[in-house]
UniProtKB/Swiss-Prot annotation:
Name of the featured protein: Pyruvate-flavodoxin oxidoreductase
SUPFAM superfamilies (UniProt xref): 4Fe-4S ferredoxins, Pyruvate-ferredoxin oxidoreductase, PFOR, domain III, Thiamin diphosphate-binding fold (THDP-binding), TK C-terminal domain-like
GO biological processes: electron transport chain; nitrogen fixation; response to oxidative stress
Binding site for [4Fe-4S] cluster 1: C696, C699, C702, C762
Record-annotated 4Fe-4S ferredoxin-type domain positions: 687-716, 743-773
Amino acid sequence: MKNRTFATIDGNEAVAQVVYQINEVIAIYPITPSSPMAEWSDAWASEGKPNIWGTVPTVVQMQSEGGVAGAVHGALQTGSLTTTFTASQGLLLMIPNMYKIAGELTPTVFHIAARSLAAQALSIFGDHSDVMATRGTGFAMLCAASVQEAHDFALISTRITLESRIPFLHFFDGFRTSHEINKIELLTTEDFKGFIPNELVIAHRSRALTPDKPVLRGTAQNPDVYFQARETVNPYYLACPEITQKVMDEFAQMTGRQYQLFEYHGDPTAERVIILMGSGCETVHETVDYLNALGEKVGVIKVRLYQPFDSQRFIAALPTTTRGIAVLDRTKEPGASGEPLYLDVVTALYEKWGVGSLPTVIGGRYGLSSKEFTPGMVKAVFDNLAATIPKNHFTIGINDDVSHTSLDYDPDFNIEPDNIVRAIFYGLGADGTVGANKNSIKIIGEETNNYAQGYFVYDSKKSGSVTVSHLRFGSQLIRSTYLINKASFVACHQWDFLEKFPILKDIVQGGTFLLNSPYDQDEVWERLPGKIQAQIQQKQLKVYVINAYKVAREAGMAGRINTVMQVCFFALSNVLPREEAIAEIKKYIRKTYGKKGDQIVQMNIKAVDTTLDNLHELVTREYSAPPQIPNHHYPLSPEGAPPSSIPYILGKMIAREGDELPVSALPNDGTYPTGTAKWEKRNIAQEIPVWDTDVCIQCGKCVMVCPHSVIRSKVYEPEQLENAPSTFKSANAKDHDWHGLKFTIQVAAEDCTGCGICVDVCPAKNKAQPRKKAINMEPQLPLRQAERENWDFFLSIPNPDRRELKLTHINQQQMQEPLFEFSGACAGCGETPYIKLGTQLFGDRMIVANATGCSSIYGGNLPTTPWTQNAAGRGPAWSNSLFEDNAEFGLGFRVSIDKQTEIASQLLQELATVVGRELVDDILNNQQNNEAEIWEQRDRISILKQKLQALVNPELTSKAQLLLSLADYLVKKSVWIIGGDGWAYDIGYGGLDHVLASGRNVNILVLDTEVYSNTGGQMSKATPKGAVAKFASGGKPAAKKDLGLMAMTYGNVYVASVAMGAKDEHTLKAFLEAEAYSGTSLIIAYSHCIAHGINLSTAMQNQKAAVDSGRWLLYRYHPDLVKQGKNPLQLDSRTPKLPLEESMYLENRFKMLTKINPEVAKELLKEAQTDVNLRWQMYQYLAAREVTQG
């Protein structure tokens, strides 16, 4: 056996390394958690890396997974070795083509990071729902249980498909395998070449469509032959299992790693056996070893080839002593007599068991949406099998108090050996903790003889969410595919987490605790929450503290504390000699940040060099009794709330205790209340804006740009200040319309993310201190309590009357209450200010169809939602369908609302003699064109409802009841279709185009970040020429799609292109005009993004630079102007005055290319400048045309 190379990589990279080498065409589209496989392929192709045949694979990005499947089908039909990667809904979009590919016996492998399907809710996490939905397509299914298996099966499945002609799904668990980092043995180029015989490749090519040997495929067949034709493939499927095992045996001869279609592990005379597939196999494997060492007789069968299901080999793998079988499925099929694997096992046993009585077979569900699957749960399943009457169709890992399917288990059951080092790190999204820990586990895996495993837990929030890193390393193979619950090392990178989460729950006696503290060493002990003090003393922990933010700030890295904490970990863990560890950290810094420029590299290295001087051991008191220091609890704390209440449910989720919620606690249809984000109080900002009353000019700009709606302004009567807190600030209102009133700008300190955009846009200058403005950043912690009281008081002040505000004046319009607040978006997000503005203007009558993407995640991800309500209980109604159908989904809203309004109007006419003709006429004739008319209409509807409720005439009651149920539709509803550029320009463009052509009164808001932000920054058709993005590693060669111009060609669509940072009044005007327009409206909003490689605190300057250079145009196309004899296109940008280079190179996404490939960067910049010039000239021409009517 040849010497082997090891690498510490995650499952996605492990698969991509193989797939890239043995394919010629790779069609891609981003979807979590499979995207990194496509990203690696694109990056290698961009570098010119060849495959085993010496050619660089063609990597082509499509507009959707449906498009990918079509491209794959076409490439396969013309003889190329072709593959793709996907998951979840993406895989479902491929199903029609999968039937075709399989029906034509075309070899290919789709590599799937298996993920939940959107049902009552979307979930990005892992289970087998997606792959099980494809069972009827004819694709074979090969399942990998670990990173090593995923690496190996990528090669094995490709060989099998070429030999069998059966297309394959090679799948592995999303996140648990796709994103787990593990030390694996790598296959080599020689392995690939030896394992993929040329004759199989030639045979595939010989079946290609070519005019040199013309044939016809894809015919339409009639009833006389279709049935028979379907049966012709049977011999291929019957042969597939034998071919698969033969290939696995050959692989074993080459590598020493033997796989079986059904691999048994356990006692040879086992009486109880669990059958499953995927990463759960590893947990069962190690639990079987533990239980058998205690004298049990148990085993596990790991299913590798699921389809075609070889019943004979399955029976042969079972010990003949088997008396009880538990089949575990990682999916749910409501209404079925059992889940898929269970049904196949039952069928196989019934058909093939032979002599003697059948074993008892029970089925169960586990692990949906990456729900934990632990040794304690495995033991519970074995215990259930040992019961006199085992529970069938059970669930494990949840508390089902509705259908009573769940098994009880011991959550503290632990089987991990003491010689495995286990460490947990609690970080904040975007503080670099996860990235640093990925590098740490790679250093350990590659620079020591240890096996290593890294797994990272984060919710779907953007930066600012909690991340938990789980690192294991030791001298033996690590099979523990579950979270650590006994850690020898715990690091807390955010002080506030001490009050929010059970940070020290899983640390062992005598363990090491590393804490990032904002306080000096001498203050730390007194500042610790009482519960933490008690745990430190009771568990006799060694505690080390560092002010990582101070070290990072002094190194010029602001909030990026990852490098600092990484150095501390290596210094305390002793896994490597200290100097060697620091050298490796610096090596990985250069590798990780080299493309971002030497300045970033040097800042990180400076942080490394200064860290250990700031790391101190904390001297704790002798233990006597738990200190009586009150703990902080969330306003939505589960303590004190009834178990059935929404506050209790959301409180448990916020406290990271959602796993404890029973089935009965959750809504059965996925419906949740709005207005809950205000209870979360994340306290993640190190600094918050503080208002200077003397300098402020009361322009409202800071309020408008605040991405999280934490800055608010109000005017009010002076007497409202009578009970104000002593630190509450106010000033005399400066607007002439508010003479004699008081004015306040207030910040929600505990909801602020500290982005600083408000400071950047503030136009006011402090003449005494030129570096100061009317709003300035100051440390949050000393201000928190006072600002909490000030915020509560501010909310008690009545809002200004919306009917009296001048909505075209920003300072007045920003007095409107936002009905979108405190989202989980990135600090400094460029999308949310537009959404917030829409809710301020129209939120109390708004219904929103939101495409899957960033805006659906920060807008609709549990536990809390930023969409909220006003004091009257009105606010945006929000829903997300899918990524690809959002435009159609929103059109459905409009069609339905219009129909219900029509029915209500008809009923109103029919009941006019009863409710009063005058009231009916007033309701039906009200145009509802402004706030005053909307308010009047609501008052009339209230009177109407009172009259309807008073009716007692039996003949009228049914109509009255119907009208009562529809009366609110007589108030104008504002339908908004919201999504990002990945939706609008790519996957959803067909539907969007149809809605634009419909003429229906919907408002479409495209939050254009110019990349697929939600999936990690991949290229879309909105990505500008020359930008480096994932899937465009060598810089995007094509120009940005002009969505606005395409929409204008219909002639009856209102179109606006806006950039708040360039011209906020223009943005406001566009929103008002779009909503007022009676047809279809489209607003394309420039939205800066963290993926642009910019400082988000000054991102509004980037927007302005984009407009000043002509890269982004401001315009409004208003069809109604044609009726007035005017040109409908109003070009609101001025002639570009900034060279494009100066705008582009403010952003790292453009600047990176100058380092990667300077010549290409120079050429693309030249082309992009030409494109900008030509586009400006075209829009100038279009806006200057004279319009003639009729």
